[in-house]
Amino acid sequence: MILDVVPNHMAASDDENPFWRDPLRRAKFFDVEWRTGGVRRFFDIGDLAGVRIEDPEVFEATHAKVAELVREGLVDGIRVDHVDGLAAPARYLRRLRDAGIERVWVEKILEPGEQLREWPVCGTTGYEFANEVTALFVDPAAEEPLTELYRELTGDERPFGEVALDAKLEQARTTFEPEVDRLQAHLHGIEETFDLPAALASLHVYRTYVDPDTGEVDGLDRQAIADARLPPRLASLLTLEERGRDAFVIRFQQTTPPVMAKGVEDTALHRYNRLLCLNEVGGDPARWSLSVDDLHAGNLERLRRIPNQLLATSTHDTKRSGDMRARLAALSWLPGERREQVQRWRRLLAHDGAPDANEEYFIFQTLAGAWPIEQERMDAYLEKALREAKVNSGWLEPNDPLERRAKDFARRAAEHVAPFADRLSTAGDRIALAQTLLKLTCPGVPDAYQGDELWSLTVVDPDNRAPVDWARRRRLLAELRAGAKPTRETAKLFLISRALELRRRRPEAFANAYEPLDMGPHVCAFTRGETYVAVPVRPEASVEVPQGYCDVLDGAALGVVLAERDRGTT
């Protein structure tokens, strides 16, 4: 069991949190300057107060039970939520290790090309892998025609980086104005003025990890600050070339992650709708696709540096489930038909209260990827997506008439999109099975999100956090184990069960070995010891069990190959 630990914040509620309630009710007994006291928010949530986990006393008080559970063998390891929100992430992780907690995974968003720091952890929670195995199945040849289509429809020719920067700057100037004011207070006495919102928005990664206590500033931090092109004086403060503003450095580094998250994940990813499968937590929609060679290189690097990294395709925070992203990736396999269908739908629905072109295109893609989606779920998702985009509606000032029109438009559009979505599902399911097999066999620890054993076409929370019918899954698994042939409904469950059985049978093969095989650009194939894996990454490609291997999938027509060497073969 992996225990989820949230060290960064706690509920600031009188009724639910005695650590918060008791000091307030007994304020006269505490030596605290209440008029000037304040708390650090978690993101923009005032009811969640930041915890000073960097203080040894606070760490001991909050982690004694966690360490006890690990020592007693009741917990195998822990997952650290939002490690970037801590004042000193590296120091916190070293304290976990010193407390005897050795298996630690961190929820850390790495930008494409960014590497995890040399921390005492098993790895991240796997968003990088989720984005890689999505991009692997996006056809690079479709980038030009589908980008042209998006620009024609919306009239917006900005690259994603520009959209993201605008959204981050917007959030820094509005949502995080209190945090900016507190940062400014830490600069009291410096005559030079800085545009702190612009500085917070300019960082290309979630944060730097400069430690004022040790004076440690590594090359990655220096490069990140240089890439941000900050004013020289501000850069010198953040790289500790000029000392005396340690509190500012710490708080600045704690503030860039929420600016990035709210600006990119919760705003820009809802504004830039070129191909929605690329709009994922930790992803970069500017990166259109990933080659087989690049996936192999990433797998080899992971095996070398962090072999116990989690591999995810869906989590509680993903914008879309892995299966839905697979269907949307399949849109790149038929760019010509996609253009024709979109133009046809727009003609048919031109007078049905259509929202703006960008929102319209978002609705078409969502219906195609999540079909069949119940209207109630679609309505709830549209409301959230429109408000997160903050263009024509928002959480602070909801545009109820526009939201109603968008929901009505989606309801009418569904009947036109449905036949296309049904055809798309065949290719999408093929991609989803291939992604699932890669997650189960690539270097790392496969992480299965609840309910993902069967097809899951869900969108962001709360949709992806609905109750799971475990009884149904147990019944279907029992039938498969009793010899039932996999159907379309059970194909994914069958693949997962067979792959896990193989991992249990041959643990040594999945510990160290990984040998990429050159099967051309349209097939991803490799061996892990005596295990052979092959998946097609384009519709025209096919794979088969090689000579000298036994089919672990017993000939099931899943479009992928999982095989082990025939022990009778010499």
Per-region residue spans from a language model:
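Conserved phosphate/anionic-ligand binding catalytic regions in large, soluble enzymes, centered on
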Residues: L200-T208, G263-V264, N308-M324, I363-I373, ...
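Carbohydrate-binding surface patches
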Residues: A491, E501, E515-E544
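Acidic/aromatic-lined carbohydrate-recognition and catalytic surfaces
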Residues: M1-F43, E72, H82-E148
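Extended, charge-enriched "interface" segments that sit outside catalytic cores
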Residues: A226-A235, R243, Q309-L310, M324-S425, ...
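Catalytic and substrate-binding clefts that recognize carbohydrates or anionic sugar/phosphate headgroups
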Residues: V210, T214-S332
